[in-house]
Amino acid sequence: MARSRRHSRSRSRSRNQCQRRRRRTYNRRRTMREKPRHSRRRRVRRRGCSCRRCSRRRRRRC
């Protein structure tokens, strides 16, 4: 019984570490987003649709 308890405890600890790591990466991504890189994203949006049919016809509207 002691062994099973120890095992479950270690599993929970590893899960917590993973969550912490994930949170850190998310924060890093957020800071990257906040840097002035919005112009590129807007340009992509302005182009409009990106589905196969429109890209084949060199036309950006469905």
UniProtKB/Swiss-Prot annotation:
The entry's keywords: Chromosome, Developmental protein, Differentiation, DNA condensation, DNA-binding, Nucleosome core, Nucleus, Spermatogenesis
Residues covered by region (Disordered): 1-62
GO biological process: cell differentiation; chromosome condensation; spermatogenesis
Annotated compartments: Nucleus; Chromosome
Keyword Nucleotidyltransferase (UniProt): no
An example Gene Ontology molecular-function term: DNA binding
Tissue-specific expression: Testis.
DNA-binding among keywords: yes
GO CC annotation, single: nucleosome
Similarity comment: Belongs to the protamine P1 family.
Main function: Protamines substitute for histones in the chromatin of sperm during the haploid phase of spermatogenesis. They compact sperm DNA into a highly condensed, stable and inactive complex.
Protein name: Sperm protamine P1
Species for this entry: Planigale ingrami (Long-tailed planigale)
